[in-house]
Amino acid sequence: FYYLNSFFSKFKLKEEEYMKDNAKIEICLEDVESVIRAEKGGADRVELCADLFEGGTTPSLGTFITARRHTTITINTMIRPRGGDFCYSDVEFEAMLEDVKAFKEHGADGIVFGILNIDGTIDKERSRRIIEAARPLSVTFHRAFDMSKDLFQSLEDLIDLGVDRILTSGGEPTVMEGIMNLEKLVEKAGDRIIIMPGCGITESNFSYLKDRVKAKEYHVYLPKEEVSKMEWRPGHIYMGGMLRQPEFQIVHTSEERVKTIVEKK
């Protein structure tokens, strides 16, 4: 009995060490097919958005419900009523609250949002209302954080608000450019809040970033372009504006790329 107990104690310690050393991987995506592929690839969680061309906006409720029906992976939903800045009108904020309630009612695991004042500080009053509406779901403050005036003051504000994690590139366009700030943010945050690096993470830089920053979670976009099945292709018509994506290329999450990242964690 003693040896058996000793064996299980050692096994438990090794399991705890494994969980401590292995970071969680969140995949950023915008469609049901991608959620399915992310789960098959071994991701821990997904951030479900619409319109990643705009940096991610609120997905449709139908997209979320279908993704929830076909997968068991943790799904956090983006709450962002439009592209552009993060200072919202009263009716835009009202829409955000309604979206939080709707996703919560239909089984979302968490929400992702970000609201700033016109001076670049965290809008604490509106953020508090979003968080109250979302609980007990997980709450992530997205890269509006990187657009704030003072990263470290914003960090303290979000900790005071009780936010669970911050998605950030360290106040720079990509994680590799913001790596020094990310190191400082992780150290400053300690166990008070999760700092989740994201934007520009690839299979080739993930291991280096993880070893440097030592974050517990990472946010990754791993697309794969696929050729449309359409045979009839009127090449002179576009659904977008001046900056447009090809109409006959479909972008989904790459299951293979997810597996590659997961193996490195």
Q: How would you describe each model-predicted region?
A:
Residues T74-S127:
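Glycine/small-residue-rich loop that forms an oxyanion/phosphate-binding "nest" at active or ligand-binding sites
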Residues E47-E54, H106, V112-N117, V163-V175, ...:
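Glycine-rich phosphate-binding active-site loops on the catalytic face of alpha/beta enzymes
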Residues T57-G83, K124-F141, N181-T202, F248-K265:
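Alpha-helix-loop-beta-strand connector modules within alpha/beta enzyme cores
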Residues E33-V35, Y88-E98, K149-D160, I201-K216:
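Catalytic cores of alpha/beta
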Residues F53-T71, N117-A133, S148-Q153, E172-V186, ...:
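Active-site-adjacent beta->alpha loops and helix N-cap segments on the catalytic face
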Residues K20-E30, R80-A95, T140-D150:
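Active-site mouth loops of central-metabolism enzymes
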Residues A23-I27, V46-L48, I75-I79, I111-F113, ...:
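Hydrophobic faces of well-ordered beta-strands that scaffold small-molecule active sites
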Residues R192-K265:
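C-terminal alpha-helical cap/extension of soluble enzyme domains
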